[in-house]
Amino acid sequence: MNPNITILFSTRIIRLFCYGFLSVILALYLSEAGFTETQIGLLFTLTLLGDAVISLWLTTSADRFGRKRTLLIGAVLMMGAGIGFVLTKNFALLALAAIIGVISPGGSDIGPFLSVEQASLTQLISNEKRTHFFAWYNLVGSFATATGALAGGWLAQSPIVLF
């Protein structure tokens, strides 16, 4: 099997595990940080709007930038947003991180990764095996999201002080 297929599957599993984890923990973290429900809702809304704009820009530019570079740009934006959420509790800075970062407060793969990965996989997999690979691609993604949410739920219920 092409090693690029393994890389695409592996990064999807890691990313969707994190998205599932965030879907449980992020609102709790923001609440513990002192944000109101309105602020948390606004931050999530800005996150989704930012994801839509960044995704549109990256996916329409993916072939010009190169698909690998596009996936790396998305990963760097996601990492930057995560660092921003860890380092500050300033609402304006968190809003900026939410807008430009590619994170998913709802646990679904809504960023640029899905379309770029799928386009890449269609070039790496023969027509005869494509349905089989895409079935596994979706299954492992769903399983990773569910496992991440489960891990987030366990952590949220644990007696360990998180924030």
Predicted regions and their residues:
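Helix-to-loop junctions at the C-terminal end of transmembrane segments
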Residues: 53-66, 156
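Residue-level signature of mid-helix packing/kink "hotspots" within the transmembrane helices
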Residues: 48-56, 145-146
